[in-house]
């Protein structure tokens, strides 16, 4: 699943150009060993856990990822820049749960949208993830996406923000 991907030079959802330092795919946490097997010999995999990066050098199925680890970072070698920030999602076969607040969940089939055969994380779900830090690029993404969100997506984001981030600045605009 890809949560943010360029189509040509443009964002898949908004059609707006915005430079990216990396690509942020999302995978279910349960698929980490499959990802590591697939990338073996191509990209180094590092766990990002509470601000600490740790190279995952062992066999894909032999090294557990702590439950507190939210992301894997990938690059060709320790001397190369990061290429991918892989977001680990908490899922069951039927349900996605927001990693920062387990009171927020959705049926797994409703967190994605598809364009040209590629699955993307729905923009309202991506914006919920971005709401935590409010970097300038996250505020820009919100401003660009907000007018494009359908009423149910806006309402879902508003409800989720009220639960996870009461008083968030985006609530006024939603």
Predicted features along the sequence, with ranges:
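Compositionally biased terminal segments of proteins
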Residues: 1-174
């Amino acid at each position: 699943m890809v949560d943010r991907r360029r189509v040509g030079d443009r964002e898949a959802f908004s059609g707006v150009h915005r430079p990216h330092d990396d690509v942020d795919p999302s995978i279910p946490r349960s698929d980490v060993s499959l990802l590591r097997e697939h990338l073996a010999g191509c990209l180094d995999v590092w766990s990002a856990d509470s601000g600490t990066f740790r190279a995952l050098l062992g066999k894909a199925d032999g090294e557990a990822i702590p439950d507190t680890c939210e992301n894997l970072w990938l690059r060709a070698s320790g001397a190369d820049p990061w290429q991918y920030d892989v977001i680990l999602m908490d899922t069951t076969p039927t349900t996605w749960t927001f990693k920062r607040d387990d009171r927020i969940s959705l049926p797994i089939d409703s967190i994605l949208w598809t364009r040209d055969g590629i699955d993307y994380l729905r923009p309202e779900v991506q914006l919920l993830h971005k709401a935590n830090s409010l970097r300038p690029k996250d505020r820009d993404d919100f401003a660009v996406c907000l007018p494009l969100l359908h009423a149910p997506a806006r309402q879902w984001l508003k409800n989720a923000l009220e639960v996870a981030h009461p008083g968030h600045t985006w609530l006024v605009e939603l």
